[in-house]
Amino acid sequence: MLNNLTIALDMMGGDYGPRSSIPAAVNAVNAHANLTLILCGNEQVISKQLESLDSLAHPRLIIRHCSEVVTNACKPGVAVRSKKDSSMRVALNLVKSGEAQACVSSGNTGALFFMAHYVLKMLPGVKRPALISAVPTERKNPVYLLDLGANVHCDAQTLYQFGIMGSVVAGQALGCDNPKVSLLNIGSEDIKGHEDIKQAAQLMQQSPLINYIGYSEGSDIFTGKADVIVCEGFVGNVALKTCEGIAKLIMNKFTAALEKHLVYKCMAFMLSPIIKKLYKRVNPDQYNGASLVGLRGIVVKSHGNASAKAFQAAIDEAVKEVERQLPDKIAAIFEKIHSKDTVNE
């Protein structure tokens, strides 16, 4: 564990802005004694919210005033060129300058992707950054799914690099040296899928850096068959949101059924420890926080509609990645690849 951690938060992003990000920030600094948070956004709004929580004078909550906000309607190019004093841009600049070790935002995904790429730059050798997040499975450990929407279409080399970065993330998070990596496809047979997926499969199969186990279908995501599942951003984003929607549907239907009859209510009371455990297992809030990997800094993207609890989960994810020194670990792997390629030339 590092002695002191500093994380910059985009307080104004997302559907709820400070209404969810400020309670999350207060809870996070209370949970982590070594954590300081720089709250980037409208000082007046932030101060008022902190005061309502009796936390205005908290020594580890530092307000950094920003005069602009990147809205959900803002186009990525406009955000990069014109929103230089936005809460998102200031938070990323703090990571670039070294004043903060990570940035967390629930703002406009496209704008965050382009702005983070522009401000922090790519790690040497990495073609494209990717969004990666944990998804619950039937087994004890989650599966790490990437890309979740940063890149709509990916060529074979990019998918291969995602496999490498996913292996590093899963290896660090799960504490395993050789995480199992799979490509998401429309079938498990070698002949299935388009040409980029087939070529990516060959690259992964031949690589000593990846423990490639073959293709996975959509139904395999939850089985725990793989530790890492790689896909294009369009597919990954649809898959993730479908997973979250199904989880909410099941829990809502289950809750409605229990409340319908007195007998079911009595059963629910007796089974409440099991029900709570199940809900905790599938609740999307605890998995909130997709990491934008491949950059020279740590950026965690929270859901735009994140509750305070969910936004705190994204902060917790950023804390873990700082402690694991994730960008350095990824950079070291790509440096080995570059050194090997140089020797072979």
UniProtKB/Swiss-Prot annotation:
EC numbers, comma separated: 2.3.1.274
UniProt GO molecular function: phosphate:acyl-[acyl carrier protein] acyltransferase activity
Claim: Transferase is one of the keywords in the record: yes
SUPFAM superfamilies: Isocitrate/Isopropylmalate dehydrogenase-like (SSF53659)
EC category name: transferase
UniProt keywords, alphabetically: Cytoplasm, Lipid biosynthesis, Lipid metabolism, Phospholipid biosynthesis, Phospholipid metabolism, Transferase
Cysteine-cysteine disulfides: none
Keyword Lipid metabolism carried by entry: yes
InterPro entries: FA_synthesis, Phospholipid_synth_PlsX-like
Gene Ontology annotations for the cellular component aspect, listed alphabetically: cytoplasm
Principal subcellular localization: cytoplasm
Biological or metabolic pathway of the protein: Lipid metabolism; phospholipid metabolism
Any one Pfam family match given in the protein's UniProt record, by short name: FA_synthesis
Localization (cell): Cytoplasm
Family note: Belongs to the PlsX family.
Primary role: Catalyzes the reversible formation of acyl-phosphate (acyl-PO(4)) from acyl-[acyl-carrier-protein] (acyl-ACP). This enzyme utilizes acyl-ACP as fatty acyl donor, but not acyl-CoA.
Quaternary structure annotation from Swiss-Prot or TrEMBL: Homodimer. Probably interacts with PlsY.
Protein name, entry field: Phosphate acyltransferase
Source organism: Pseudoalteromonas translucida (strain TAC 125)
